A protein has these predicted regions:
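Conserved RNA-binding domains used in RNP assembly and mRNA/RNA metabolism
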Residues: 1-90
Length: 90
């Protein structure tokens, strides 16, 4: 996916708030939160994204520690969507 499409999706209310289902071209699907770190704009311009995976979301919400996040290439994303339980609440 290109960075403009990804940014439009997450900056529409999901950045650092809601978990997003991220489907990859060659990896397993994950749930994660896109986080806004000091280097967010620089990474975004290169189509890289800092994401906290589902296993670390609760800890990240308490600490806001960006060391819990990993950087992923947006070029490997196939689709972004809200998980079913979040989509039902919206």
């Amino acid at each position: 996916m290109i960075n403009e499409v990804i940014a439009k999706f997450i900056e529409g209310g999901h950045l650092a708030k809601n978990a997003v289902k991220i489907e990859f071209k060659k990896r397993n699907t994950i749930l994660g939160i896109f986080v806004q770190s000091p280097d967010y704009e620089d990474l975004k311009s290169k189509n890289f994204w800092r994401i906290v995976s589902e296993t670390n979301i609760n800890e990240w919400k308490e600490s806001q520690d960006n060391k819990l996040a990993k950087i992923f290439s947006g070029a490997e994303f196939n689709r972004l969507s809200l998980p079913k339980q979040v989509a039902a609440q919206v």
